[in-house]
């Protein structure tokens, strides 16, 4: 079964996801909608400062984009209702504009003929969120879903492994997060977040994150037990979660590492990674796992109170799981 996908919004996630989709024979991207023209879409797809040049053939003929010989329909519609996804029999629309963040707004894609929609951000309403390795089993055919955030995709699988085995009593999370497109290169106006308006090139910027609270939505047993903050740092890609928890069951740090290592080779094999190497952030650039546990970076105060460190490529890891979710929901009518 070939899954036919349309992308609405060709930003960082849209482009990285497009690249990763080329490696999956069961996924075909048939259309891209963005406000930029086909020439600029081709340029941004071909060249990437973080992930390098596109490994494939890109051709424009008569204002039409062809990638590796396959035609990609390019449109420039502001209103998703006008996208005519039905003409291409689109199975899943990847809603990656960062604008249509509710079921009501994203339903316009359904009205345009798409069968299902994945929002690539935490929703601003009660649209259900699904995280691979955590709650895919709760999907029952909803037409519009969210893949949560990149940080939630790192934190939730790790928290699930720990909670299932040791029962988390409470915890705090910090994500040290690479720069994203919403930040300013030099100091600028940011009424909603004054610190967020400061130069991303020169500062470590304290910020908020809903990732820890979102874990309580995909793992209800942890609802109200986790919260956290973020620091935006001047690196281009790859982020890291620092999770400090108090567990009910006693275990040494070494015991906990072994449980995570086991999960990385079994139930969480394509989600969680495990390393004992002396790694740094750039070592994970391009990694499609969403939570790579760093055994040498964590520690414990005692047998109930531990600090866990897990890396994630906030672009590739997340985008790969959007594709996984696309494959999964397409098996439901």
From Swiss-Prot:
The record marks 177 as: Activates thiol group during catalysis. Pathway: Carbohydrate degradation; glycolysis; pyruvate from D-glyceraldehyde 3-phosphate: step 1/5. GO terms for molecular function: glyceraldehyde-3-phosphate dehydrogenase (NAD+) (phosphorylating) activity; NAD binding; NADP binding. Signal peptide: none annotated. InterPro entries: GlycerAld/Erythrose_P_DH, GlycerAld_3-P_DH_AS, GlycerAld_3-P_DH_cat, GlycerAld_3-P_DH_NAD(P)-bd, Glyceraldehyde-3-P_DH_1, NAD(P)-bd_dom_sf. NAD(+) binds at residues 12-13, 34, 78, 120, 314. GO terms for cellular component: cytoplasm. Its main location: cytoplasm. GO terms for biological process: glucose metabolic process; glycolytic process. D-glyceraldehyde 3-phosphate binds at residues 149-151, 180, 209-210, 232. The active site is at 150 (nucleophile). Belongs to the glyceraldehyde-3-phosphate dehydrogenase family. Catalyzes the oxidative phosphorylation of glyceraldehyde 3-phosphate (G3P) to 1,3-bisphosphoglycerate (BPG) using the cofactor NAD. The first reaction step involves the formation of a hemiacetal intermediate between G3P and a cysteine residue, and this hemiacetal intermediate is then oxidized to a thioester, with concomitant reduction of NAD to NADH. The reduced NADH is then exchanged with the second NAD, and the thioester is attacked by a nucleophilic inorganic phosphate to produce BPG. This is Glyceraldehyde-3-phosphate dehydrogenase. The gene is gapA.
